[in-house]
Design a protein with these regions (language model features):
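Positively charged n-region of N-terminal signal peptides that target proteins for export
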Residues: 1-10
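Intrinsic disorder/low-complexity segments
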Residues: 4-5, 18, 174
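Intrinsic structural disorder/low-complexity segments
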Residues: 9-13, 204
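C-terminal segment of classical bacterial N-terminal signal peptides
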Residues: 14-23
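A composition-driven surface/loop motif
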Residues: 24-223
Length: 223
C-alpha cells in the first residue's frame, strides 16, 4: 500500500514539473482594450500593429498606430445603433497615459464625422475612458488624429502636453471631460472640430475648468 502511495506521489511530481510555469500563473488583466481585445500580461505589445503597454506606469504607447473599425462594444441603453470604443478603458482604471510617437497615428475614419453611424448601424468613440484621468503625451512633433461619430475623446480629467498635436473631428462634442482639461507645454497643439450634424454641440466641453498653458495652442472649430 505504501509503495502504491509513493508511486502515485512520484508520478504527480513528474506531471507537475511538465506543466509550464506560465500555465500555473493567472493571467493579469489591465482593463484597457485595443483592437477589440483586452490588454493582458500575455498580450501587452504588438510591434506589427504599433502599440505597447507598460503595466507598471499604465502607459499605452502608440507608434504610427492606425485603427478604423475594430472597437470594443459599449453597453448603453440605446437602440438606434451599437456604440463602440476604438480604445476602451474600464471604469476600474483611474489613471492612464497614452504616449504618441510618430506622425501617422490614426483612430477612426474620415467619413465618420459626417454620418450618424456606419451602414452596419455602428457608431464609434475614439478614446472612451469615462472614469479615467487621461494624459496624452509623446515626443516632439508626434501627431494623433481622431475622426469619429461620437466623442473623439471622453474621459474624467484630460491633460495634453509635451509638444504633441491632437487633431480631433466628430459629429457632436469632440472632446468631453467630466472634470478639467489641461493643455500645456510649448508647441502642444489641439485642433478640435465638430461637423455639427448634432446641432448645438461644443467642440470641447469640460464640467470643470479649461486651462491652456503658455506656448500651447487650442483651436476649436464648428462646421
Amino acid at each position: 500500500m505504501k509503495s502504491l502511495i509513493l508511486c502515485f506521489l512520484l508520478t504527480l511530481c513528474v506531471m507537475l514539473t511538465l506543466v509550464p510555469s506560465v500555465a500555473l500563473a493567472a493571467e493579469e488583466r489591465y482593463g484597457v482594450w485595443i483592437l477589440d481585445e483586452e490588454i493582458t500580461s500575455s498580450r501587452k505589445i504588438s510591434r506589427k500593429e504599433g502599440w505597447e503597454f507598460d503595466p507598471n506606469t499604465y502607459t499605452l504607447t502608440l507608434r504610427n498606430f492606425q485603427i478604423g473599425t475594430i472597437g470594443t462594444k459599449i453597453s448603453a441603453l440605446f437602440d438606434k445603433y451599437s456604440l463602440f470604443g476604438l480604445i476602451y478603458v474600464d471604469t476600474s482604471v483611474h489613471d492612464l497615459t497614452i504616449r504618441v510617437e510618430g506622425r501617422e497615428n490614426y483612430l477612426g475614419d474620415e467619413a465618420f464625422p459626417y454620418e450618424n453611424c456606419t451602414k452596419y448601424k455602428e457608431a464609434y468613440y475614439g478614446i472612451y475612458a469615462t472614469n479615467t484621468n487621461l494624459t496624452i503625451t509623446g515626443n516632439r512633433g508626434a501627431i494623433l488624429k481622431i475622426q469619429t461619430h461620437e466623442n473623439a475623446i471622453e474621459c474624467k480629467n484630460l491633460t495634453i502636453k509635451d509638444s504633441v498635436t491632437v487633431e480631433a473631428v466628430s459629429q457632436g462634442t469632440c472632446i468631453y471631460s467630466g472634470g478639467d482639461i489641461t493643455i500645456e507645454g510649448v508647441g502642444t497643439i489641439v485642433n478640435a472640430r465638430t461637423t455639427d450634424i448634432i446641432k448645438g454641440q461644443a467642440t470641447m466641453s469640460a464640467r470643470g475648468k479649461l486651462y491652456v498653458g503658455e506656448g500651447a495652442l487650442d483651436h476649436m472649430f464648428r462646421g
